[in-house]
């Protein structure tokens, strides 16, 4: 296997990574490549850091899209249709890396023979791996087609403007040449399909009525029948061949264009993450289906007109009746299909909501489990699912009508036509009757494809609207204006900026400031300093401006808008956040930014990064950015790749960065050092590790401007000091650095300090100048000094020595816990997605049957299907029987002569035959309605039960499952797989069951007329068996590959959306786009082959069907005079019907099995996922008022995160007294977070026990335990919904209690400003609140809960010092009678604790009062305090 060279030898093969198959150019692996659109050279260091994700998923990298473009450019000079026309050449040469379809001749192309070698490979191996699959053709590559679609869309926008622009017209132009050609092929199919029944079958049946035999003439008729069927089959195959390639090109183009747009968005507030995932999974599929099936709609009117004309010629005026039935049914089917599409459209919205909520649940599952909110979220998802199910049921009824109409309409048309024809006194012969019936059968093609076509076009129409709304969203524009002075890096002049928020939101999107300072020290008089010390003159009007919603008339153009990018009227609302910002930052300056929670610090740096809308003033920037977000964004890649972020590996610089960011000790405890794979969102890292990796990425990038948003908040004092001095002050000495922080001691060393308040810069200058100003800054800094003065003197000389050593050892619980247990695969965290092998086991079908209601329900459904098809067959047989009876031996008198009549109109029982014939139609309609209702209810019950059981299993899975499984993979089960089970599987299963029974009836009818027919069926059955065995494996394996390649690109979308700000700042859009194109093309390759494999089978099955109809024709010829013409007509009509039906049925069998792989994947999770302990254990529930005291006892507690991993807690024993306040400190990897994991039983103990008030927590249910504990997490978590639902999901508290909690957390005024107060919307991830505000709401949530035991995990890290002090005071008061465990890195937050617990290497090494520990200068706690305390004491 080739290693991918991304900078020396730093990427090594992972077990999940497969060979790259002799590809000359691999995206993201070769240096110096040219982007045709920009002409820029993209060197090796600009490659996508997500390369390694492919290894985990077992994916390959396709031929470079750039090499594609080069080849296409060369071919473009030969003519636009050169490649298409070259298929007509009798001799062709194969070029390297060419997809077989590109080299296929016309015969091979339309019969899909180019796919046969792959079918042979699969048959021999019994399975299919990605290395067996050809890379996607250069003509189908997503990049090539995206560029074309993008150009067409841009031309449309330029021509008519964004409001009038039609994406439908653009899509039509994109596809039209190939679609027109496919429609021409479809016309040939229709003409051939019509000619056989209309002319050949008619003459053949007339021949059976003739008394004389003419063998030569009759054999020519059979030959004609054979030829028309072959032309029909192959021209239809060519239609599909063209449509499938068109569909794949359109899907690749529109999905790539969508992701390209996502990467350019300012924010995604108008689109939820669930909607974007749905767009990129289901909507892309709908665009493909529209291109593949939509053009078949054109065949309907043609065959209807031809059939009507022909029937009138055969029967006279009554021929209009049957055609009228078809003509009436055609718009009726269109209407029903549109109704189906309407309900599908409503269902899509419900699915979006469900997927979004599922994504939220999966993202914050740890928090949901700890808060015992599993039931609340389960009910929320179930409520959405119930609404989705209700809509699906309505859509299912209409869909069932469309499936069953085709065979019914033939009977209805026949009954109406022949009954009226006979009633009016016209005669009817077998040749006439069965020619008309056969023509009716050929006309059903229009009705068969109508539900597919209309459904696909209607759903695509919805998808197009969603894509268009995405394409018209406002893009982020990096600031291009340069400051006037070369020494100035950032310049803002009188800048007023606003955040964009969703237009549909019930509220504005506030970045509000909690009024934490009211009744506090008022700012003293301010003086104007020479260094432009600023205090805003707008304090009087801030309250009025705050929360002011800007309507469209208030929108003012930004520099970006002046370049043609405008905010469209009514498209969004703007929330003013920053006011009249005047700022100049010189090159090489370290600028500290501070202020209270929600004061606008993050907004200020977002404005500099171009993330906000400029309303007034100007912004100018000179240089490139490196950005460290407040909540670190970590890729699912190796630790090294996260730091390199696509740049070339420079060992010296890399090692220097590791040292500056204190990452060396962490590498020592990771199983594969810096090549250890990091989970999604840094799942196997602590908050501090994530932040340091994010900082290391910035340092390694070597940019000119560094924007650091509170990068030290999650770090302990020693590490924070080291990083500030070594990384920020020393390493970035010559760089321009914007350093946002709440830890004011660091501002002492900044060249300049900016203090923000309510969206304005109120103070600015050096630390000394601001202290002399004696304003807000001096007030909060003095509070810091007062609050942190230790009771004993600390000598800080030891800070750099002894304390560092303890960090080098000991397993880091957050990292060790989620590693792969098997040592041979060290460093690999995310497990390769399982892929089923062999055929779908019967147990999967049994699971589906059981979910649908059990064997009895299945038997009832099957009986209804048989009765339904049987009633259709009976009506046709009754017609032949009626014709055979003729006059019923009635005697006709002509003058003096009498003779036996042959005319049916003379039959004395005419009314009897006609009544039975009409009654059969009524019975058939009733049975169809009953069958439809029962089938829809059964399949929906199955899909709903599978969904509910899957959801239950996922929610009850232990944390190790979520740590080793990408969210995209789990979401794939709930989005694409559930879509298959909800919609596509029932649709195809219904047709399959109906058609397979119909096939047996057809063969039975023909065999009843010609018993010798069964002799010919024998060899054909052998051929069919061989085909079925080969195709079944091929189709099933390709479908499985399609399923597993879907997950990585969905994960990539999710990850990219979460890191949009970072991607923008580092200007890595192109690299992430290339990675997406690779993942999409890897999915498109098996997806395209899967669709082609269906037609490969269909063409070959059609040959068997043609053999059957030819055999029937020969039987009629050779048994001339032995068989009544009525029965001969019956046989030939069923034989003609069998031609398309047989291949369609067998293809449906393979496709239905392929769809069942989604059931298999869902069932795999249901059967294999291990479960946590029960939520409640009967007879073991603790007392209702437990715990009364809050005493916690650990007795020799041992814990490891998975088997075969080292212990992270080693025989830990201690007792925490009731109401005691404990501070827990320790270096990274010491086991602090593991204590919390053990207490909440997120991981079960390996040994020992934990007791709360004497009750062993392992003996009670998880809900009983977790509901009695409260936690305020390190990273604040808000869910989409309302403020109330975030604080009180179970509606347990009164409004007064909620407002009281908000007041005590200083969020009351913030929430009171919102239009809907407690019912105001909280956006996904709480994006309409700052990180500090989110944390305050989390504290309010804990206040409401008021448990006897509270764990604070660095709960106030995202707050300014003053808010921190106020909140600490609130917590002390509110939880005075509670046992409180505080895990902290900022040591001043635990100095007031009753006792301090110091952990090292999973053991308690010190546990005493702060005064005792600080009086011992050799204690670990003393050494840890030295860094922070010394800094404030000396510099302050």
UniProtKB/Swiss-Prot annotation:
Coiled-coil boundaries: none
EC number, as in UniProt: 7.6.2.-, 7.6.2.2
The record's family statement is:
Belongs to the ABC transporter superfamily. ABCC family. Conjugate transporter (TC 3.A.1.208) subfamily.
Q: PROSITE patterns under this entry?
A: ABC_TM1F, ABC_TRANSPORTER_1, ABC_TRANSPORTER_2
- Ranges where the record places region Disordered: 12-40, 499-569, 795-822
User: Composition bias, kind Polar residues: at what positions?
Assistant: 499-511
PTM Phosphoserine: at which residues?
A: 14, 19, 43, 60, 505, 509
Q: Which residues bind ATP 1?
A: 595-602
Q: Where does ATP 2 bind?
A: 1226-1233
Residue ranges annotated as compositionally biased, kind Basic residues, are: 514-529
Q: Where does the record place Basic and acidic residues bias?
A: 19-36, 545-559
Presence of the UniProt keyword Protein transport in the record: no
Q: What is this protein called?
A: ATP-binding cassette sub-family C member 5
The UniProt transmembrane annotation reads 179-199, 219-239, 296-316, 317-337, 400-420, 426-446, 608-628, 847-867, 916-936, 996-1016, 1017-1037, 1101-1121, 1126-1146
Principal cellular location given in the protein's record: membrane
**Top EC class per UniProt?**
translocase
Q: Where on the chain is Phosphothreonine found, per UniProt?
A: 513
Q: Which gene encodes it?
A: Abcc5
**Briefly, what is this protein's role?**
ATP-dependent transporter of the ATP-binding cassette (ABC) family that actively extrudes physiological compounds, and xenobiotics from cells. Mediates ATP-dependent transport of endogenous metabolites such as cAMP and cGMP, folic acid and N-lactoyl-amino acids (in vitro). Also acts as a general glutamate conjugate and analog transporter that can limit the brain levels of endogenous metabolites, drugs, and toxins. Confers resistance to the antiviral agent PMEA.
Q: What else is known?
A: Although other labs have confirmed the ability of ABCC5 to transport cGMP in an ATP-dependent manner, they obtained a much lower affinity for this substrate. The authors conclude that ABCC5 is a low-affinity cyclic nucleotide transporter and a major function in cGMP excretion is unlikely.
Extract one GO cellular component term from the record: basolateral plasma membrane
Residue stretches making up the ABC transporter domain = 562-783, 1192-1426
Instruction: Provide the residues annotated with a glycan attachment (glycosylation).
Output: 494, 636, 684, 889, 896, 1043, 1328, 1416
Topology in membrane: Multi-pass membrane protein
Q: Which GO terms describe its molecular function?
A: ABC-type transporter activity; ABC-type xenobiotic transporter activity; ATP binding; ATP hydrolysis activity; ATPase-coupled transmembrane transporter activity; carbohydrate derivative transmembrane transporter activity; efflux transmembrane transporter activity; glutathione transmembrane transporter activity
Q: Which reaction does it catalyse?
A: ATP + H2O + xenobioticSide 1 = ADP + phosphate + xenobioticSide 2; 3',5'-cyclic GMP(in) + ATP + H2O = 3',5'-cyclic GMP(out) + ADP + phosphate + H(+); 3',5'-cyclic AMP(in) + ATP + H2O = 3',5'-cyclic AMP(out) + ADP + phosphate + H(+); N-acetyl-L-aspartyl-L-glutamate(in) + ATP + H2O = N-acetyl-L-aspartyl-L-glutamate(out) + ADP + phosphate + H(+)
Q: Which InterPro entries match?
A: AAA+_ATPase, ABC1_TM_dom, ABC1_TM_sf, ABC_transporter-like_ATP-bd, ABC_transporter-like_CS, ABC_transporter_C-like, P-loop_NTPase
């Amino acid at each position: 296997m080739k290693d991918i060279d991304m900078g020396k030898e730093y990427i090594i093969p992972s077990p999940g990574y497969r060979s790259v198959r002799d590809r000359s150019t691999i995206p993201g692996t070769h240096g110096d490549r040219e982007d045709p659109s920009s002409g820029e050279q993209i060197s090796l260091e600009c490659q996508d850091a997500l390369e390694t994700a492919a290894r985990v998923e077992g994916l390959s990298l396709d031929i470079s899209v750039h090499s594609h473009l080069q080849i296409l450019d060369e071919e473009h000079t030969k003519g636009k249709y050169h490649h298409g026309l070259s298929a007509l050449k009798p001799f062709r040469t194969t070029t390297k890396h060419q997809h077989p379809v590109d080299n296929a001749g016309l015969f091979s192309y339309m019969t899909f023979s180019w796919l046969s070698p792959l079918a042979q490979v699969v048959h021999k191996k019994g399975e299919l791996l990605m290395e067996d699959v050809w890379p996607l053709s250069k003509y189908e590559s997503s990049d090539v087609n995206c560029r074309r679609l993008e150009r067409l869309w841009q031309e449309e926008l330029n021509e008519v403007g964004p409001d009038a622009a039609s994406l439908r017209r653009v899509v039509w132009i994109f596809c039209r040449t190939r679609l027109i050609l496919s429609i021409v092929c479809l016309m040939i199919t229709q003409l051939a399909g019509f000619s056989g029944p209309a002319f050949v079958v008619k003459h053949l049946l007339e021949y059976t009525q003739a008394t004389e035999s003419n063998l030569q003439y009759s054999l020519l008729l059979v030959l004609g029948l054979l030829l028309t069927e072959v032309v029909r089959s192959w021209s239809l195959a060519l239609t599909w061949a063209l449509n499938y390639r068109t569909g794949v090109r359109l899907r690749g183009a529109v999905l790539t264009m969508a992701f390209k747009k996502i990467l350019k968005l300012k924010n995604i507030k108008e689109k939820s993450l669930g909607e974007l995932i749905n767009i990129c999974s289901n909507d892309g599929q709908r665009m493909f289906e529209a291109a593949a099936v939509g053009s078949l709609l054109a065949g309907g009117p043609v065959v209807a007109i031809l059939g009507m004309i022909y029937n009138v010629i055969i029967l006279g005026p009554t021929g209009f009746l049957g055609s009228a039935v078809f003509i009436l049914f055609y718009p009726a089917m269109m209407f029903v299909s549109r109704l189906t599409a309407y309900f599908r459209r409503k269902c899509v919205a419900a699915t979006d909501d469900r997927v979004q909520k599922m994504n939220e649940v999966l993202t914050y599952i740890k928090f949901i489990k700890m808060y015992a909110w599993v039931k609340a979220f389960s009910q929320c998802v179930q409520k959405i699912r119930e609404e989705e199910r209700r809509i699906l049921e309505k859509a299912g009824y209409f869909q069932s009508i469309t499936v069953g109409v085709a065979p019914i309409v033939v009977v209805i048309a026949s009954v109406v036509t022949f009954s009226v024809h006979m009633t009016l006194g016209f005669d009817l012969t077998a040749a006439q009757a069965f020619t008309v019936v056969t023509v009716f059968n050929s006309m059903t093609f229009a009705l068969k494809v109508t539900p597919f076509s209309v459904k696909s076009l209607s759903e695509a129409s919805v998808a197009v609207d969603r894509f268009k709304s995405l394409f018209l969203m406002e893009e982020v524009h990096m600031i291009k204006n340069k400051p006037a002075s070369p020494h100035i890096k950032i310049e803002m002049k009188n800048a007023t900026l606003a955040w964009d928020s969703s237009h549909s939101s019930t509220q504005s999107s506030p970045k509000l400031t909690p009024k934490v300072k009211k009744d506090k020290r008022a700012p003293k008089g301010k003086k104007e300093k020479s260094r432009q010390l600023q205090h805003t003159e707008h304090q009087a009007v801030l309250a009025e401006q705050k929360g002011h919603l800007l309507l469209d008339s208030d929108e003012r153009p930004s520099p970006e808008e002046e370049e043609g990018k405008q905010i469209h009227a009514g498209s969004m609302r703007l929330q003013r956040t920053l006011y009249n910002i005047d700022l100049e930052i010189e090159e090489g300056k370290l600028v500290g930014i501070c202020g209270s929670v929600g004061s606008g610090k993050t907004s200020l740096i977002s404005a500099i990064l171009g993330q906000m809308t400029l309303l007034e003033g100007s912004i100018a920037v000179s240089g490139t950015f490196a950005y460290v977000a407040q909540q670190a964004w970590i890729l699912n890649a190796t630790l090294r790749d996260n730091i390199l972020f696509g740049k070339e590996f420079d060992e010296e610089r890399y090692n220097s960065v590791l040292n500056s960011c204190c990452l060396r000790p962490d590498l020592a405890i990771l199983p594969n050092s810096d090549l250890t794979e990091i989970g999604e969102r840094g799942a196997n890292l602590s908050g501090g590790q994530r932040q340091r990796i994010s900082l290391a990425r910035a340092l390694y990038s070597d940019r000119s401007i560094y924007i650091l948003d509170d990068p030290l908040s999650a770090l302990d004092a020693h590490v924070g000091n080291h990083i500030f001095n070594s990384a920020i002050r020393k390493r970035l000495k010559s760089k321009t650095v914007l350093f946002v922080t709440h830890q004011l001691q660091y501002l002492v060393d900044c060249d300049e300090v900016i203090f923000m308040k309510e969206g304005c810069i109120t103070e600015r200058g050096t630390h000394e100048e601001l202290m002399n100003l004696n304003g807000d800054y001096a007030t909060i800094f003095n509070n810091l000094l007062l609050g942190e003065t230790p009771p004993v003197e600390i000598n800080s000389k030891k800070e750099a020595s002894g304390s560092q050593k303890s960090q080098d050892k000991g397993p880091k619980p957050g990292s060790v816990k989620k590693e792969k247990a098997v040592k041979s695969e060290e460093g690999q965290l995310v497990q390769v997605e399982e892929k089923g092998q062999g055929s779908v086991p019967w147990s999967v079908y049994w699971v589906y049957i059981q979910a649908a209601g059990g064997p009895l329900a299945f038997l009832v459904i099957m009986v209804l299907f048989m009765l339904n098809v049987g009633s259709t067959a009976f009506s046709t047989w009754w017609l032949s029987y009626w014709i055979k009876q003729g006059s019923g031996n009635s005697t006709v008198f002509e003058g003096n002569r009498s003779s036996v009549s042959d005319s049916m109109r003379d039959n004395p029982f005419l009314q009897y035959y006609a009544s039975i014939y009409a009654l059969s139609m009524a019975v058939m309609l009733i049975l169809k309605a009953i069958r439809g209702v029962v089938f829809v209810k059964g399949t929906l019950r199955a899909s709903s039960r599978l969904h509910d059981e899957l959801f239950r299993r996922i929610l009850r899975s232990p944390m190790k499952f979520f740590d080793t499984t990408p969210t995209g993979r789990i979401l794939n089960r709930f989005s694409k797989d559930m879509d298959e089970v909800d919609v596509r599987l029932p649709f195809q299963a219904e047709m399959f069951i109906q058609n397979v029974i119909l096939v047996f009836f057809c063969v039975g009818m023909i065999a009843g007329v010609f018993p010798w027919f069964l002799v010919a069926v024998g060899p054909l059955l052998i051929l069919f068996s061989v085909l079925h065995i080969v195709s079944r494996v091929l189709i099933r394996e390709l479908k499985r590959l399609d399923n597993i390649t879907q997950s990585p690109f969905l994960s990539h979308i999710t990850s990219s959306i979460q890191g949009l700000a970072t991607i923008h700042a580092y200007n890595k859009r192109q690299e992430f786009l290339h990675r997406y194109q690779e993942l999409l093309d890897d999915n498109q390759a098996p997806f395209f082959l899967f669709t082609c494999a269906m037609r490969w089978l269909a063409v070959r099955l059609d040959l068997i069907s043609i053999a059957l109809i030819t055999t029937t024709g020969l039987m009629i010829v050779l048994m001339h005079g032995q068989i009544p013409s009525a029965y001969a007509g019956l046989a030939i009509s069923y034989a003609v019907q069998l031609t398309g039906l047989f291949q369609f049925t067998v293809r449906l069998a393979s496709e239905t099995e392929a769809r069942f792989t989604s059931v298999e994947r869902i069932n795999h999770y249901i059967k294999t996922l291990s479960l946590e302990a029960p939520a409640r254990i009967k007879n073991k529930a603790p007392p209702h008022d437990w715990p009364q005291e809050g005493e916690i006892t650990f007795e020799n507690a041992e814990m490891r995160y998975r088997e075969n991993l080292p212990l992270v807690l080693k025989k830990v024993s201690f007792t925490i007294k009731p109401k005691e306040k404990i501070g827990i400190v320790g270096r990274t990897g010491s086991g602090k977070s593991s204590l919390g994991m053990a207490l909440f039983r997120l991981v079960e103990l390996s040994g020992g026990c934990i007791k709360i008030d004497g009750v062993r927590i392992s003996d009670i249910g998880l809900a009983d335990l977790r509901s009695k504990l409260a936690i305020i997490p390190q990273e604040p978590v808000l869910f989409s919904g309302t403020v109330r639902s975030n604080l009180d999901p179970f509606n347990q508290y009164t409004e007064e209690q909620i407002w009281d909690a908000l007041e005590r957390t200083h969020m009351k005024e913030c929430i009171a400003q919102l239009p809907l107060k407690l019912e105001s919307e909280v956006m996904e991830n709480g994006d309409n609140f700052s990180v500090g505000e989110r944390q305050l709401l989390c504290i309010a949530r804990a206040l409401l809960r008021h448990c006897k035991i509270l764990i604070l995990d660095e709960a106030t890290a995202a707050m300014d010092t003053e808010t921190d002090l106020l909140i600490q005071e609130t917590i002390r008061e509110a939880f005075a009678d509670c046992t409180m465990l505080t895990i902290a890195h900022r040591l001043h937050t635990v100095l007031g604790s009753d006792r301090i617990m110091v952990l090292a290497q999973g053991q308690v090494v010190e546990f005493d009062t702060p005064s005792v520990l600080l009086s011992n200068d050799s204690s670990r706690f003393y050494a840890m305090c030295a860094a922070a305390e010394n800094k404030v004491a000396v510099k302050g």
